[in-house]
């Protein structure tokens, strides 16, 4: 048996591994559907999607089968199914759980492991237990949920998406409601304009297509003769084709993304939370 660093860290807390859950092929889409297993249905209403890619985990937790399940996230794969299934899905800061290893030339490591649960308390308890075995030295200790939190936070509030467009009214309203709650608790609230640069979405799509390419070739190398790339589903095939079609654009896109990572880290020096 072989365990990733994150898997070993989770198992070392004493959690029991019951089995694997459904994901889309290679976890590359925001819904959990595959040719092999079909669609994973939302337990609240089987006519709806669980979201993805950690849809199987989210369905099990939402249905009450287990109180907590492993999930991971590159571009929303914890947060999307948590939202669809009415759960808590936290993509924690890099390093809270041991990161997946990615090639050093990538502009950032966006692949994070985590869990989905039914309450903030459960998610907090999981991360507090994780750090007992392998603390995240670059961050303050999480501690127990019963501890007080006397420090007042500076919270940036953003209601635009990464394209600079307004989000749907109900999402804007929910964001303002949370901001007012935080303000009532004594935290400092500041509305901000969109910090993302104009080509961010285009560059991120090139990064995502590159992930499709990386996964296809790393899996092919791992399985060698057992891997038949002609059996890939349409979405991975599309991403790989998009990567090759736009490969001349990748270096500049990665440079802009790497620059944005640095700019964003500087931006967050002025705030504790971006809401």
Residue ranges and their predicted role:
Residues 21, 191-198:
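Acidic carboxylate-rich catalytic motifs and surrounding loops in phosphoryl-/glycosyl-chemistry enzymes
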Residues 1, 149-158, 207-265:
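Short helix-loop capping/hinge segments that flank enzyme active sites or metal/cofactor-binding pockets
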Residues 11-127:
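Short glycine/serine-rich loop segments
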Residues 167-193, 217-226, 250-271:
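Acyltransferase
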């Amino acid at each position: 048996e072989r365990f990733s660093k994150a898997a070993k860290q989770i198992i070392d807390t004493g959690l029991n591994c019951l089995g694997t859950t459904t994901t889309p092929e290679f976890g590359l889409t925001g819904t959990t559907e595959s040719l092999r297993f079909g669609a994973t249905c939302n337990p609240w209403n089987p006519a709806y999607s669980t979201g993805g890619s950690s849809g199987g985990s989210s369905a099990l937790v939402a249905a009450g089968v287990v109180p907590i399940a492993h999930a991971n996230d590159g571009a929303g794969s914890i947060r999307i199914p948590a939202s669809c299934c009415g759960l808590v899905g936290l993509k924690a800061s890099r390093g809270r759980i041991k990161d997946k290893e990615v090639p050093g030339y990538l502009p950032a490591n966006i692949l994070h492991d985590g869990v989905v649960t039914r309450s903030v308390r459960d998610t907090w308890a999981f991360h507090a237990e994780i750090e007992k075995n392998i603390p995240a030295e670059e961050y303050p200790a999480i501690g127990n949920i019963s501890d007080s939190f006397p420090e007042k936070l500076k919270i940036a509030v953003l209601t635009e998406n990464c394209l600079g467009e307004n989000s749907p009214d109900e999402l804007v309203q929910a964001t303002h409601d949370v901001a007012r709650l935080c303000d009532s608790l004594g935290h400092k609230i500041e509305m901000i304009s969109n910090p993302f640069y104009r080509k961010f979405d285009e560059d991120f799509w090139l990064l995502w297509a590159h992930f499709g390419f990386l996964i296809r070739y790393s899996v092919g190398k791992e399985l060698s003769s057992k891997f038949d790339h002609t059996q890939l589903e349409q979405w991975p095939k599309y991403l790989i084709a998009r990567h090759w079609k736009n490969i001349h654009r990748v270096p500049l896109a990665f440079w802009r993304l790497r620059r944005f990572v640095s700019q964003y880290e500087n931006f967050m020096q002025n705030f504790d939370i971006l809401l």
